[in-house]
């Protein structure tokens, strides 16, 4: 294998891409084939056999789903492609978010029998949020029910995308043989068992007419993207291959079009043209606008261009604890150059760190390199303080990039070590896991002393418990899953908080008059603090203490001790004492005022509501809907996808525990579901009473 040193390539020859898809669309298989044909692998891994390169954690090998996005480097026709494999399961949305943040483009893989499935919509929206250019690959063309044009149509109806098929399939289902390239107007057939040998031939006579028609449709859509081409098209002039590619590339990078290809990754068909499309249509780091950051010294906006001579800037998008090498920090370089052994400044933490080794990752193997440059995706060793979302930069020019936002956890689980010897190991293991996964929260319940882990769903926490056993050798006992309830208020209220202590020597004096108001859910804020005092009744230096007192009180609401959310706190008035006032006194006074105001403001309990999408054969629909109704669910839509029915419902999280087992028995194992957090909503009074009683 050529050394990586020899294979540093120019920036315009780098592609940083992700492969995104619904859980079973064949994304990992597609990645495997890409690695095989680009020469990084000597045998083809198969997810069903558990030998896939990117699925390298034991849990993934067993479950056949991708959990941790692995970064892999490969080469194709002189271009370097860095691939970040992203999970398609909703409990791992955070992994997808952070991968998309550092990518330049993506391949969206779809199952040609289903087209856009629920999870593909979620991932697509996340990619929209970060303006990631995409090409689409309709996979599984050999599967019964495969329908290329139906699948393409779902991109329009479900995702409002502008798909432009640049290929058409030759046959489908068991007769799928290859593809017709509508730009070159050639047929491509794969002639060897492993798919590494393929050849271009003339289009068979019986397909010529359809191919002409499909090419015409493609040209029409391409012409809509560019004035010059439109004129040529209307004049009936010849449009060259180069012109089509140039216009498509520009439109893809600007997110105005999605080139669509097809194939059957498992049957080794369609991968090489897909790699060509990555090079032809997805951006290099040079095609994208400079990255935006803020200068630490004065908060001014600065832009960093992908240039080795600019100050070094990189974003940490993942942390992994490797059993042999220790902490691996994955980062994307936006500007400048970093040598191994040199110092780097973590501007998020305000700490200087030394990067002792730099490695390029190939799923679970590593290749050491001496330096990194713009566009590189690498992992560093020795960065002890760095966490996901941190900015690494040049100490002389400290800047900070925008952080990655992660959703709050909605489900908790109490865990305890099975034996005394597991106790110390558990603390270390949880620390390591929460470093890797920003959506995993770990806390110790002050009253019971129990360790509570919180995450994004039942599967998320199951896998955490599983990893504790396997990777860290910690055996734990697990409690029942608990819902992360919240408390809020329905009306505004005012209250006074006074904290006065006169003992010998210096006293304590804090006095606050506070108004609290509900923040509407659509504002998306959990807390806002406003100082409306006038005339210096409370000196400004005590305001941070007042805010801290309120925030502390919000950690435990009056109804059942759950955290309080969606509150606007306004300090109206108060008073202070020249000698006796202190931060402590105002913190306590604010906390007292808040607790008093909460009682008057009609506090209510909120519960997480999940969006549930169930795909089932029609005959089980009645039973499934009846069961949903018994779980306080609201059915929002019924759709038909091929020969299956899809039920979309909103259901309280508390009613979903163990749902996988129920659904299996209701449908004889033939229905599947995905569930993700939707929003918080007020708990009905009768149910709220029960929850409050238990507490």
UniProtKB/Swiss-Prot annotation:
Q: Which UniProt keywords apply?
A: Cytoplasm, Elongation factor, GTP-binding, Nucleotide-binding, Protein biosynthesis
Q: Which residues bind GTP?
A: 21-28, 85-89, 139-142
Does Nucleotide-binding show up as a keyword for this record? yes
Q: Where is the tr-type G domain?
A: 12-286
Q: Which GO terms describe its cellular component?
A: cytoplasm
The intrachain disulfides are: none
Gene Ontology biological-process entries: ribosome disassembly
Q: Name one Pfam family in it.
A: EF-G_D2
The protein's superkingdom reads Bacteria
Molecular function via GO:
GTP binding; GTPase activity; translation elongation factor activity
The record's similarity note reads:
Belongs to the TRAFAC class translation factor GTPase superfamily. Classic translation factor GTPase family. EF-G/EF-2 subfamily.
Matching entries from HAMAP family are given as: EF_G_EF_2_B
Give the protein's biological function.
Answer: Catalyzes the GTP-dependent ribosomal translocation step during translation elongation. During this step, the ribosome changes from the pre-translocational (PRE) to the post-translocational (POST) state as the newly formed A-site-bound peptidyl-tRNA and P-site-bound deacylated tRNA move to the P and E sites, respectively. Catalyzes the coordinated movement of the two tRNA molecules, the mRNA and conformational changes in the ribosome.
What's the protein called, per UniProt? Elongation factor G
């Amino acid at each position: 294998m050529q050394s990586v040193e020899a294979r540093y390539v120019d920036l315009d020859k780098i592609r940083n891409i992700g492969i995104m898809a619904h859980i079973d669309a064949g994304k990992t298989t597609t990645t495997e084939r890409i690695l095989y044909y680009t020469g990084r692998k000597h045998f083809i891994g198969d997810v069903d056999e558990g030998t896939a390169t990117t699925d390298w954690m034991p849990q993934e090998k067993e479950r056949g789903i991708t959990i941790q996005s692995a970064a892999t480097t490969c080469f194709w026709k002189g271009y370097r492609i860095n691939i970040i494999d992203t999970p398609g399961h909703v409990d791992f949305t955070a992994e997808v978010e952070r991968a998309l943040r550092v990518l330049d483009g993506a391949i969206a893989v779809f199952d040609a029998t289903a087209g856009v499935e629920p999870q593909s919509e979620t991932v697509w929206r996340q990619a929209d949020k970060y303006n990631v250019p995409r090409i689409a690959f309709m996979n599984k063309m050999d599967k019964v029910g495969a329908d290329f044009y139906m699948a393409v149509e779902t991109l329009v109806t479900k995702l409002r995308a502008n798909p432009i098929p640049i290929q058409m399939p030759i046959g489908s289902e068991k007769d799928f043989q290859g593809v017709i390239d509508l730009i070159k107007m050639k047929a491509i057939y794969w002639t060897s068992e492993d798919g590494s040998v393929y050849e271009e031939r003339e289009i068979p006579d019986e397909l010529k007419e359809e191919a002409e028609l499909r090419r015409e449709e493609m040209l029409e859509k391409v012409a809509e993207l560019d004035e010059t081409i439109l004129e040529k098209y209307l004049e009936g002039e010849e449009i060259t291959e180069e012109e089509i590619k140039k216009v498509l590339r520009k439109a893809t990078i600007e997110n105005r079009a999605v080139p669509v290809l097809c194939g059957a990754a498992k049957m080794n068909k369609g991968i090489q043209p897909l790699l060509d499309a990555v090079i032809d249509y997805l951006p290099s780091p040079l095609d994208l606008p400079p990255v935006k950051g803020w200068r630490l010294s004065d908060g001014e906006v600065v832009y960093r261009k992908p240039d080795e001579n600019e100050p070094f800037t990189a974003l940490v998008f993942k942390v992994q604890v490797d059993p042999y090498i220790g902490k691996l920090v994955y980062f994307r370089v936006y500007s400048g150059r970093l040598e191994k052994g040199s110092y780097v400044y973590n501007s998020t933490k305000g700490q200087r760190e030394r990067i002792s080794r730099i490695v390029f990752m190939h799923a679970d193997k590593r290749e050491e390199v001496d330096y990194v440059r713009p566009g590189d995706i690498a992992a560093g060793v020795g960065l002890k303080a760095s966490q996901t979302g941190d900015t690494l930069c040049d100490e002389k020019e400290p800047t900070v990039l925008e952080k990655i936002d992660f959703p709050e956890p909605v489900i908790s689980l109490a865990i305890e070590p099975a034996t005394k010897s597991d106790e110390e190991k558990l603390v270390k293991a949880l620390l390591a896991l929460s470093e890797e996964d920003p959506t995993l929260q770990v806390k110790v319940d002050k009253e019971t002393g129990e360790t509570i882990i919180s995450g994004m769903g039942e599967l998320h926490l199951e896998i955490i418990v599983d990893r504790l056993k396997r990777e860290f050798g910690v055996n734990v006992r697990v409690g029942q899953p608990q819902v992360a309830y919240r408390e809020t208020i329905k009306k505004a209220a005012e209250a006074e908080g006074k904290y006065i202590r006169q003992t010998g020597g210096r006293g304590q004096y804090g006095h606050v008059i506070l108004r609290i108001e509900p923040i509407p859910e659509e504002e998306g804020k959990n807390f806002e603090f406003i100082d409306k005092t006038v005339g210096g009744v409370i000196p400004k230096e005590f305001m941070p203490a007042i805010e801290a007192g309120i925030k502390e009180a919000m950690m435990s609401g009056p109804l059942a001790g759950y955290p309080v959310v969606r509150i606007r706190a306004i300090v109206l008035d108060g008073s202070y004492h020249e000698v006796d006032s202190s931060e402590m006194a105002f913190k306590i006074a604010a906390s007292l005022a808040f607790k008093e105001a909460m009682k008057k403001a009609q506090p209510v309990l909120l519960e997480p509501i999940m969006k549930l999408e169930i795909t089932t054969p029609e005959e089980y629909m009645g039973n499934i809907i009846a069961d949903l109704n018994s779980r306080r669910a609201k059915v929002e839509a019924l759709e038909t996808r091929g020969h299956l029915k899809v039920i979309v419902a909103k259901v309280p999280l508390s009613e979903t525990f163990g749902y996988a087992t129920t659904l299996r028995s209701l449908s004889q194992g033939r229905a599947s579901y995905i569930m993700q957090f939707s929003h918080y909503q007020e708990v009905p009074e009768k149910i709220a009473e029960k929850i409050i009683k238990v507490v």
